A protein has these predicted regions:
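HhH-family (HhH-GPD) DNA N-glycosylase catalytic core used in base-excision repair
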Residues: 1-298, 302-335
């Protein structure tokens, strides 16, 4: 989700191995796809692929109706109308969030682009429209491709200490020791435990992957931004609030669609509240969230699946969001 770019009147990116140009108008999402090397393997029509990726089948009205009836959630819901939780490819999602530790969104985008351009396969979008003629999209590199790279090569993409973790996890996934697809059958608790066994994955990254790749909509990632909002809006007078208490509150308060609530709060805090200065909090250090991020990013790359008994210490937005699955249109001239 970090690689999509505004081009012309639409957005350019990749859905798995497919280069895609998407443009929305009048509640209709028009999508064009570039060439792929294995067209025979894909039997689904493009509208179905796009609708699945952007989760256009999620009952957004019902999900929003399940949000807590409190001022901050009401404001966030009104501000973020149409925001959806996308369904990302599992390996791409996991690798990207391993790279995200202690990084701002702009830096994550830079890393994602560097990995794609250095290790990913280039796909061209031909005859889409003049604004994007001959535009090349690099798809995210496979686990096998990154497993055959080196730490130095990954560091040259801006990963720093994260290179060790990404390389180790890529090798586990590539070898089949970490079977990301098979993990879909696990319960939420077991899935989180499996993810946290991987190098570079702590509670926050695990929850991000559960939410965006495994569609576990109860997952509620807590980073510095979210903790800041939670403390200010729900615990303004609490001097001592550890991460365990905060997690339990989120589970009970936000419920079965906590992941959606988290995204609405996150986007609202980073845009409307930040611009108005309303998200300012006291100078009390946000130790629990920061420690979580350190755990996510600095876990040793020598961890393996066999160490499962060791305890872990611990937007994509469819424009307007009103497009339904039936309104996705495959534009003429698709390849």
């Amino acid at each position: 989700m970090f690689h999509w770019e505004k081009v012309g009147r639409g957005f350019l990116g990749a859905i798995g191995e497919y280069p895609v140009y998407a443009e929305q108008g009048n509640n209709v999402l028009r999508v064009r796809r570039g060439a792929t090397p294995r067209p025979a393997r894909e039997t689904r029509a493009l509208p179905r692929i796009v609708a699945e990726y952007f989760a256009l089948d999620h009952p957004l009205a019902a999900i929003c109706a399940s949000f807590p009836d409190d001022p901050i959630m009401t404001a966030a819901q009104n501000f973020c109308g149409g925001l959806r939780i996308i369904r990302q490819p599992k390996w791409e999602c996991l690798a990207t969030f391993i790279c995200s530790s202690m990084k701002q969104v702009a830096h994550i985008r830079q890393i994602s682009r560097a990995l794609r351009e250095r290790f990913g396969v280039a796909r061209s979008l031909l005859r889409v429209r003049p604004a994007v003629d001959n535009y090349v999209v690099h798809v995210f590199p496979s686990a096998r491709r990154l497993a055959n790279s080196s730490q130095n090569e990954l560091r040259e993409c801006g990963l720093g200490y994260r290179a060790k973790n990404l390389l180790a996890t890529a090798r586990l996934v590539s070898s089949g020791e970490a079977d990301l697809e098979a993990w879909s059958a696990l319960s939420d608790l077991d899935l989180q435990a499996k993810l946290c066994e991987l190098p570079g994955v702590g509670a926050k990254v695990a929850n991000c992957v559960m939410l965006f790749a495994y569609e576990r909509l109860r997952a509620f990632p807590i980073d510095v931004w979210i903790e800041r909002v939670l403390r200010q809006q729900y615990f303004p007078r609490a001097r001592k609030l550890n991460s365990q208490r905060l997690r339990k509150f989120c589970e009970s308060h936000f419920g079965e669609h906590g992941g959606y609530a988290q995204q609405y709060l996150f986007h609202y805090a980073r845009t409307a509240l930040r611009k108005s200065g309303g998200s300012k909090v006291s100078s009390t250090p946000l130790r629990s969230a920061r420690n979580n991020k350190r755990n996510d990013g600095r876990m040793g790359g020598n961890k393996s699946i066999s160490r499962s008994k060791r305890k872990n210490k611990s937007k994509s937005r469819s424009e307007n969001g009103t497009t339904s699955a039936a309104q996705v249109v495959s534009a003429p001239g698709l390849r």
